[in-house]
Amino acid sequence: MAQQRALETTSHNIANANTKGYSRQEAVLATTTPYSYPGMGAGQVGTGVAVQRLRRLRESFLDAQFRNESKALGRWEVRRDTLEKLEAILNEPGDNGLSKLMDRFFAAWQELAKNPDGDQGLAVRSVVRQEGIALSEAFNHLAAQLNDLTADLNTSIGVRVNEVNSLARQIRDLNAQIVKAESGNMAANDLRDRRDLLLDDLAKVVPIQVEEDRYGAVSIVVRDHTLLSGQQVNELGFDPSTGKVTWPDGVELVAGAHLYGSLEGLQEARDSVVADYKDQLDKLANYIAQAVNAQHKAGAGLDGTTGVDFFEGTDAGSLKVSDAIMGNLETIAAAAPAYDDDHNPVPPPPGDGSNALLIAQLKNGWDSNGDGKIDVVFSGEYNAWVADLGVKGQEASRMVDNQELLTEQLDSRRQAVSGVSLDEEMTNMVRFQQAYNAAARVITAVDEMLDTLINRTGLAGR
């Protein structure tokens, strides 16, 4: 029976050679209690072999290391994916990117400075207005895409919270099955494999600390709160309106000094990565609106009107060409103000495009503080954070590659311990089969001896 049980275990290993998370099992054989003959110095006679236990070949230290690296991988994968989406949204360098649109906007003012009068002047003014519309719509579109990305990240956070809760419940149920099986001296090896696989999945979502009690059940701690203890799951909650993830006691799930897991990675992407670039985009749109409006209000339109804003809005989402400009091209202030002897505004002299030139020169920089020093260069501000985005994206890609390599190496080490080698199992199968056949031959020989003893003794010579 022992050899048959060992063969069954080998068969189970072979059948699950390609099953994800399966740990190789081994039938541990031990001699049974010997029979002692009575009398002085009679000795003992062996009574055979029995399966002492079915051992699951697994290294808990390697599991802990693998999960430790998985939590870092989960965070970096989210960061890389988010930065790649940001790069796709900005579309730089590209003909329709914000950098090109800013260049075209200021180039239109440069052209207006050369041709401020007559029908040609009106035609160029129309180009200026259209380039202003294109620039403001580009800001609007980028802001909308960043808002959509934020909403998508928020949805993903809710999905991850549900995943954490689902995994915790499944692990709790497996805890109960494992404790029940092992309390009855049954091996719960396959159940433990399923639980370890769930723990691997959970470790990639949130940073976990796992402890197993003497009955075989595991408890799970996430940061400073217990997620699972015994049969109690403290499920995470998520409020889509605030974006907060909370524990049942109302305490918010807060990341530590180092971020781990895809859930914390998503929170970082939403609250830090995307939010920072959205703030910078709003800041750039506001700078352009302030700078152009300040200079535009200082100039005069074709009818001598001054003090007209070219843009309206204070951020990327609200930026637009002002209603005054949209309603009348002549209000575009290409010239310096002109006054009569009574200091009343009059139409500027022909050929004056001085104010348009000053607006065109804003491309090279703007004195936002009025101290005579240029402190804001629009293209420089934009190109700097686009370059920063590229650098951060490359860093995230490298970190993902590094973490994938580490987890693959650790998983290979785990497989060296727990994985099924078909060659080894085939060798074991032959070995156990031969032992089984030999045992059968022994039984046959004993049977023949007993037959001779019982049925044939005393028949000789008859």
Q: What name fits each language-model region?
A:
Residues M1-R462:
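S/T-rich, low-complexity, solvent-exposed segments of bacterial secretion/appendage proteins
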